[in-house]
Amino acid sequence: MGQEQDTPWILSTGHISTQKREDGQQTPKLEHRNSTRLMGHFQKTMNQVVMPKQIVYWRRWLSLRNPILVFLKTRVLKRWRLFSKHE
């Protein structure tokens, strides 16, 4: 933990960030504007990168032939042909 210019000491206790005031009391700290802006930028960038990859993976997955479905389809078609021949 370091002290930056214009930024009070910041202590991280578990998931709650607190800042130490001049009188020694700790108060809950709101996230610094720059870190909030940076996180928003990071999330936006990750969404732009991750979403197209997810779409590509889904398209690949959907384009793959599912062996079980192919097996069932051929089995049903064979039975249908046999059944229709007997009638």
From Swiss-Prot:
The keyword Membrane applies. Its main location: host cell. One of its GO terms (cellular component) is host cell mitochondrial inner membrane. It is found in: Host mitochondrion inner membrane; Host nucleus; Host cytoplasm, Host cytosol. Residues 65-87 are annotated as: Mitochondrial targeting sequence. Pfam families: PB1-F2. The record marks N66 as: Low pathogenicity. Is not encoded in all strains, and seems to be dispensable for replication. Plays an important role in promoting lung pathology in both primary viral infection and secondary bacterial infection. Promotes alteration of mitochondrial morphology, dissipation of mitochondrial membrane potential, and cell death. Alternatively, inhibits the production of interferon in the infected cell at the level of host mitochondrial antiviral signaling MAVS. Its level of expression differs greatly depending on which cell type is infected, in a manner that is independent of the levels of expression of other viral proteins. Monocytic cells are more affected than epithelial cells. This is Protein PB1-F2.
